[in-house]
């Protein structure tokens, strides 16, 4: 394949994020990269796509920058760009927990586990494995037996922990996320909250799936990614599907956004049911005047009314 997708982050000091963002955007555009990069005084968090030559130049440039010494890139081969545009944006945090007293992973974070060590932890009876991602990411794929926090945003995780603290306080905690950046901060937060034995999967699911020894074993489903691919394979030992179709509950790994632009909820839907229910998550959203599916497919008012009737057949 002629293209690659890079996933990376580095907690480091960037003195002037706004200036860095402006200059870095120009650099990325010169390389004809596309993607999303967040920068703040605490570091950089990015995912970009580009040709093999362009991504080689990009990785070399960051590795030669003293601020990013030791940066690790997770690399996926791709058939083309995984993004439509290139954005580099300054932010308060490169991953938002929105804590009053923020956690600095360079000073406080959980123990790092290699893929092999993490696999052993998955099999341990005295260890609780907590998924540090959002609920819709978990629903598409997760490690076998992992706890699913009921959250739609990373910043909601601290409140969820406070509500469920008593269940886990005396346990060994192991956490994981897509590439490792959320766990760096989340595991530090757990230590700050009084949890004593906290570890994290170094390099995240992306690293675990490429490890030649673990081969993604004990991962069920697919890994959600924040680009146009939507999902990627992880388990190369015994693949299973855990995602359930929004309307009929059958196995499904196809995510779409609800066609109501004011909702935009992510749902797992088959192509057949996307058409049947006008790309929406509910009758209310399907009948919305700005339904994107209706506009995209030039569906007449008569046909729209006909398909809206399909919602009556759903089990209440």
Curated annotation (Swiss-Prot):
Active-site residues, Swiss-Prot/TrEMBL: 177 (cysteine persulfide intermediate)
Annotated ranges, domain Rhodanese: 123-217
Protein origin, superkingdom: Bacteria
GO MF annotation terms: oxidoreductase activity, acting on paired donors, with incorporation or reduction of molecular oxygen
Pfam families per the UniProt record, alphabetical: Rhodanese, Rhodanese_C, UPF0176_N
Family annotation (InterPro entries): Rhodanese-like_dom, Rhodanese-like_dom_sf, Rhodanese_C, TrhO, TRHO_N
EC number: 1.14.-.-
GO biological process: tRNA modification
Catalytic reaction equation(s): uridine(34) in tRNA + AH2 + O2 = 5-hydroxyuridine(34) in tRNA + A + H2O
Gene3D superfamilies per UniProt: 3.30.70.100, Rhodanese-like domain
Keyword tags: Oxidoreductase, tRNA processing
Reported function: Catalyzes oxygen-dependent 5-hydroxyuridine (ho5U) modification at position 34 in tRNAs.
NCBIfam families noted in UniProt: PRK00142.1-3
Family designation: Belongs to the TrhO family.
Name of this chain's protein: tRNA uridine(34) hydroxylase
Species in which this protein is naturally found: Staphylococcus saprophyticus subsp. saprophyticus (strain ATCC 15305 / DSM 20229 / NCIMB 8711 / NCTC 7292 / S-41)
